[in-house]
Amino acid sequence: MHNLPTKATYVNTQGETIYLSHAGFTPRATEDGDLRWVWDEDLIWSRDHFLDAWPEDEMFKKAIVVHGHTPVPYLLEDIDPACRMGEVEPGALWYCDGHKVCVDAGAVFTGYCSLLNLDTWDEEVFSTEPYLT
């Protein structure tokens, strides 16, 4: 596990820049106009970015952060405290004006897992029940 990368960047077939990390983050630009990554530990564990506003820098206009770490039902409770776990449809959650997507369906709690095609944004949600026996 220690040798795995903590982040990756992918440009999809639509020309969108996708930043992937376990916990997600809000991108920021350096003074030179490059991406300023956050600390590796934050890319793995942080939940502090959920309510951040998306940066207005031109380089992030066609950028999307894809992450997991926090199951969608719990993330929704951070964004809207009126949401409750049992009321959430299984699948990915798009937020931050469509620039962030959490793909953690919370399989251990909900029994669902989601996959997201980074080129088409098609989502596949499936039940983990058949695999838990």
Give each language-model segment a name.
Residues 123-127:
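Short hydrophobic/aromatic-rich beta-strand segments that constitute the beta-sheet cores
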Residues 128-133:
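Short, solvent-exposed aromatic-acidic interface loops
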Residues 113-115:
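C-terminal regions of proteins
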Residues 12-14, 117-122:
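Short acidic-glycine loop/turn motifs at beta-strand connectors
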Residues 1-101, 106-111:
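Acidic, His/Gly-enriched loop-helix segments that form or flank divalent-metal centers
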